[in-house]
Regions:
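Ferredoxin-type iron-sulfur electron-transfer modules and their immediate structural context
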Residues: 5-92, 101, 110-111, 125, ...
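Iron-sulfur-cluster electron-transfer modules
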Residues: 40-46, 75-250, 254-269
Length: 269
């Protein structure tokens, strides 16, 4: 009996029953971009996903993958050519829903599946070969683009309005952004600039007068939704809270989506 329970306690644990274990991306390892090993890992993971399909109702990556397999000659991953993997990867938004909530084979399971990280690995290989489109890479330069957007906010907001059908059609042809998508408007000034002019006038006649808060404005509040930060600032000042503002720069998520991992590390620092 003791031996039986010992074996049970050492069996592979199913993932997603507890918090999944996420391993760091070792993008500097020589095998990370090895074409043969990457292709083998793609096929291994796709085959496991094909046999499970628990993630069928998440992002479009999985329906694309399963449809391709079902329509292949032998209805298996081996019937797919490596060139067919790209649409599956392109549909992944790196939202992590599969890894965090659905997949039963994430670490600590022996299958060690991390679908988003694998998609990122494939994109990194595509980037090295020059197969990623250049426009999304430029759109990922959030701080540069947003500073221009704020500087010329009236013109940019007018041009990006969905009612401006001609310019939105041209924008769609150039960038691939659907003309029906409502794009965020730019502030007439950054929240950081607004804060510098309005950080004083704190109400010190309150029980909260000795408290301090830092507002991390994020790129969206700093460049697009200033009123969110303004509202928070007003509430905090009225309650006597001393406020500081910080916007060190874009978090780097757009660079992650474009597989620019060194730039992501740089932004994190």
């Amino acid at each position: 009996i003791i031996n039986y329970y010992f074996k049970l306690s050492h069996m592979s644990k199913e993932g997603s029953l507890g918090a999944p274990i996420r391993h760091p991306i070792d993008f500097e390892h020589p095998d990370f971009l090895n074409p043969e090993k990457l292709d083998a890992e793609m096929r291994r993971v796709f085959d496991i996903c094909h046999g499970c399909r628990r993630c069928f109702n998440l992002c479009d990556s999985f329906p694309k993958l399963f449809d391709m397999i079902d329509e292949s000659k032998n209805e298996d991953v081996e019937s797919l050519s490596s060139d067919q993997f790209a649409p599956v990867v392109d549909a992944c938004t790196l939202c992590d829903m599969c890894f965090m909530t659905k997949c039963p084979y994430v670490p600590p399971h022996d299958f060690d599946l991390d679908f988003p990280h694998l998609m990122l690995r494939y994109r990194t290989a595509q980037k090295k070969l020059g197969k990623l489109p250049s426009v999304p890479t430029q759109l990922a330069q959030i701080d540069r683009n947003a500073k221009i957007g704020v500087m010329f906010s009236k013109i940019v907001n007018w041009a990006s309005n969905i009612k401006n059908k001609l310019i939105r059609k041209v924008l769609e042809l150039i960038t691939g952004i659907d003309k029906r998508v409502q794009l965020p408007k730019y502030n007439s000034e950054t929240f950081s600039n607004f804060f510098k002019k309005n950080k004083d006038k704190i109400n010190y006649q309150t029980p909260s007068k000795d408290r301090k808060v830092v507002i991390y404005s994020t790129c969206f509040v700093n460049f697009n939704k200033k009123n969110t930060g303004v509202a928070a600032l007003k509430v905090l000042k009225k309650n006597g809270v001393e406020v500081q503002e910080a916007y060190p720069g874009c978090c780097g998520m757009p660079f992650l989506e474009q597989a620019d991992l060194p730039k992501v590390v740089e932004q994190a620092k």
